[in-house]
């Protein structure tokens, strides 16, 4: 599960990431990313990336939307240590996300983050 400090909660944070951040579209997802270091007032103390989800009614009824959101939260938890700190990432699910597998959603998210150069290389320590 995605840790609490790694979640975007405030509407203002979502708005900044979507409006002022970069965007990368995939078949079932749109990934928005905003570097908080660009605006000093937005630098928070948790020293890690934050993730937010947008799953609209276009994805399906409530049961399907919540299923998609749970799967995306689980996928985001795997990327917490891989995404550069001080980054806000908003993932907007498109209608195809309802039928896509978790592996496919993870692949699309990784592809979007890689295209935006947000993944940091994780060095193996002995």
UniProtKB/Swiss-Prot annotation:
SUPFAM superfamilies: Ribosomal protein S5 domain 2-like
Presence of the UniProt keyword ATP-binding in the record: no
Enzyme Commission number: 3.1.26.5
Xref: InterPro entries: Ribosomal_Su5_D2-typ_SF (IPR020568), Ribsml_uS5_D2-typ_fold_subgr (IPR014721), RNase_P (IPR000100), RNase_P_CS (IPR020539)
A molecular-function term among this protein's GO annotations: 3'-tRNA processing endoribonuclease activity
Gene3D superfamilies reported for this sequence: 3.30.230.10
One Pfam family here: Ribonuclease_P
GO cellular component labels: ribonuclease P complex
Transmembrane intervals: none
Reactions listed under catalytic activity: Endonucleolytic cleavage of RNA, removing 5'-extranucleotides from tRNA precursor
Function according to Swiss-Prot or TrEMBL: RNaseP catalyzes the removal of the 5'-leader sequence from pre-tRNA to produce the mature 5'-terminus. It can also cleave other RNA substrates such as 4.5S RNA. The protein component plays an auxiliary but essential role in vivo by binding to the 5'-leader sequence and broadening the substrate specificity of the ribozyme.
NCBIfam families listed in its UniProt record: rnpA
Description of how the protein assembles with itself and partners: Consists of a catalytic RNA component (M1 or rnpB) and a protein subunit.
Family of this protein: Belongs to the RnpA family.
UniProt-recorded name of the protein: Ribonuclease P protein component
Species the sequence originates in: Rhodococcus erythropolis (strain PR4 / NBRC 100887)
Lineage: Bacteria, Bacillati, Actinomycetota, Actinomycetes, Mycobacteriales
């Amino acid at each position: 599960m995605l840790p609490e400090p790694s979640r975007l909660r405030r509407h203002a944070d979502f708005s900044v990431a979507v409006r002022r951040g970069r965007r990368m579209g995939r078949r079932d997802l749109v990934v928005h990313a905003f570097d908080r270091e660009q605006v000093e007032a937005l630098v928070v103390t948790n020293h890690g990336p934050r993730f937010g989800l947008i799953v609209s009614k276009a994805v399906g009824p409530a049961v399907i939307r919540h299923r998609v959101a749970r799967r995306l939260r689980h996928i985001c938890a795997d990327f917490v240590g891989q995404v550069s700190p001080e980054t806000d990432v908003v993932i907007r699910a498109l209608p195809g996300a309802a039928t896509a597998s978790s592996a496919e959603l993870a692949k699309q998210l990784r592809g979007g983050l890689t295209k935006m150069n947000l993944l940091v290389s994780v060095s193996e320590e002995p």
